[in-house]
């Protein structure tokens, strides 16, 4: 990947050259300050003040130029508006086309200005991170706190561009008035549902969204998948060839995601009854549910590595393992063996191909629909989470065929066996391997067919993200200076767990802790629900299934509200803190304080915990995708794998907690299992406040 120094020089507008952040100067100043502090020439307080002053001057120059350019664009739009008013009275169609092209020219200049701001905002972030890294001092915290919250903040002008958005609105409105719509003119304010079909406006909106992190429901939902985008310019060419994209293969990945989530949650309402029928305690349901997560800890790594070579074979292997695992799960009752049941669940966990599903979307889906695919991944997961318990509630019957028993405990296994067998056949017939895998397969096995496409994705991904002309000696010196900190290898993906861990900044670690906490709290709530509700309220399996299905059905509506409205009113970090506090309140409400534990208390506390954990997950992954290194966008040890491992470990620990607490008796189970998530939630809140300003 091209480093930022080269990228800045290659992409800057020549006539605006003197107004960009002087990235080279800032890096040299950092180097000098490091040497001076090591020699004892300056103390850190002096360095902090001097560097702050220099950065203030850089930002002031950027902001004043930005305001000047906004004024020029506003004047041009005003002049064109006067022409538009005159032309609409004359009804001269030819002049209308010329005027529309003039507006589009303003749009092109606006895109240049948006990229100017984006490049400078990126430069400021990188310089702040470099300072923290070089000095081991949280300069970002100090600088953001003192500058961003000041009433005369210039930093806000760079990161919160109200003026630019106003220019975008004026441009969109005027182009809409000129758009022919059944013989009348349009107003974007009177007809907000009408889409303005103009490529310039599409490009402008894309640039604004990239710059401001503006969020729609689709974007918010897509960020749940944590499919990290590499740091490319908004106008960059998509490296995934449209011809190499195969829609049915994407659908098969999403169906795999859906079925796996159904497979995970379909046993939750009946796991305690199954354990009792095999002679174990009801709380062994924690081990039964958690054994799948234990295996997933390991399967996520080897599936992620396997996806470097193929997507088809891992999905086939996944289907076979899940078929075999569910078969053993279903047969365990007639074999009267808890061991067989646990082996079956372990095999199901070893078939978890979610890392492959994420990787396929990241690497093999064109950029223009990758957001929709990511949202589809999350929607499939949410739908599976809701359908699993609901399906279990429908399987309340009992009959025998020969010596095989079919009841509420074994039917989930039999149903999923059939589902995975059908999926395997569909996969074998319809899946097409991406081009670079198919070509290598052709070389080794010419007879193999049915899994090919034409584009060479591997070569495309290997190309530099930005290219430019050869730079002069000064630029080479700057690049060499970059390489003192970041070797050529440092631009590639992480190649080991240790190298991935080194890329985790304090902000990323805190977000992973929050992710661990919310998954822990949700797993405790879901996995022990059948035991708790049976002990305190004498609920039937159907009642538990309905309750869990209702919880699962809240996922998409909650994300719709947060993604469409809440994130447009508040910053992500503000929603993060508020959600953590609400999860904490939900956990505190869940404790049994009196001998009588009521249904309203349990249901209300469960809803608060689950709903706000869902809100927290979306915002957490949104922030995580923003603060995580772009080096974790690809490769085996990618950001999606790290988040999956954190969440899976949380589930393992939570399920183990339920089983261990079960030995103390059902009366103490609820309060004992709620103590760890309470402590972790408080710790994550403290950690969030400590890194709050780095989430800017």
UniProtKB/Swiss-Prot annotation:
<feature type="transmembrane region" description="Helical">
    <location>
        <begin position="315"/>
        <end position="335"/>
    </location>
</feature>
<dbReference type="InterPro" id="IPR051068">
    <property type="entry name" value="MFS_Domain-Containing_Protein"/>
</dbReference>
<dbReference type="InterPro" id="IPR036259">
    <property type="entry name" value="MFS_trans_sf"/>
</dbReference>
<dbReference type="InterPro" id="IPR004331">
    <property type="entry name" value="SPX_dom"/>
</dbReference>
<feature type="transmembrane region" description="Helical">
    <location>
        <begin position="338"/>
        <end position="357"/>
    </location>
</feature>
<feature type="transmembrane region" description="Helical">
    <location>
        <begin position="575"/>
        <end position="595"/>
    </location>
</feature>
<feature type="transmembrane region" description="Helical">
    <location>
        <begin position="411"/>
        <end position="431"/>
    </location>
</feature>
<dbReference type="InterPro" id="IPR011701">
    <property type="entry name" value="MFS"/>
</dbReference>
<feature type="transmembrane region" description="Helical">
    <location>
        <begin position="278"/>
        <end position="298"/>
    </location>
</feature>
<feature type="transmembrane region" description="Helical">
    <location>
        <begin position="603"/>
        <end position="623"/>
    </location>
</feature>
<keyword id="KW-0812">Transmembrane</keyword>
<dbReference type="GO" id="GO:0022857">
    <property type="term" value="F:transmembrane transporter activity"/>
</dbReference>
<keyword id="KW-0472">Membrane</keyword>
<feature type="transmembrane region" description="Helical">
    <location>
        <begin position="375"/>
        <end position="395"/>
    </location>
</feature>
<dbReference type="Pfam" id="PF07690">
    <property type="entry name" value="MFS_1"/>
</dbReference>
<dbReference type="GO" id="GO:0016020">
    <property type="term" value="C:membrane"/>
</dbReference>
<feature type="region of interest" description="Disordered">
    <location>
        <begin position="470"/>
        <end position="494"/>
    </location>
</feature>
<dbReference type="Pfam" id="PF03105">
    <property type="entry name" value="SPX"/>
</dbReference>
<feature type="transmembrane region" description="Helical">
    <location>
        <begin position="543"/>
        <end position="563"/>
    </location>
</feature>
<feature type="compositionally biased region" description="Acidic residues">
    <location>
        <begin position="471"/>
        <end position="485"/>
    </location>
</feature>
<comment type="similarity">
    <text>Belongs to the major facilitator superfamily.</text>
</comment>
<feature type="domain" description="SPX">
    <location>
        <begin position="2"/>
        <end position="145"/>
    </location>
</feature>
<feature type="transmembrane region" description="Helical">
    <location>
        <begin position="512"/>
        <end position="532"/>
    </location>
</feature>
<feature type="transmembrane region" description="Helical">
    <location>
        <begin position="669"/>
        <end position="689"/>
    </location>
</feature>
<dbReference type="InterPro" id="IPR045264">
    <property type="entry name" value="SPXM_SPX_plant"/>
</dbReference>
<protein>
    <recommendedName>
        <fullName>SPX domain-containing membrane protein OsI_17046</fullName>
    </recommendedName>
</protein>
<keyword id="KW-1133">Transmembrane helix</keyword>
<feature type="transmembrane region" description="Helical">
    <location>
        <begin position="247"/>
        <end position="267"/>
    </location>
</feature>
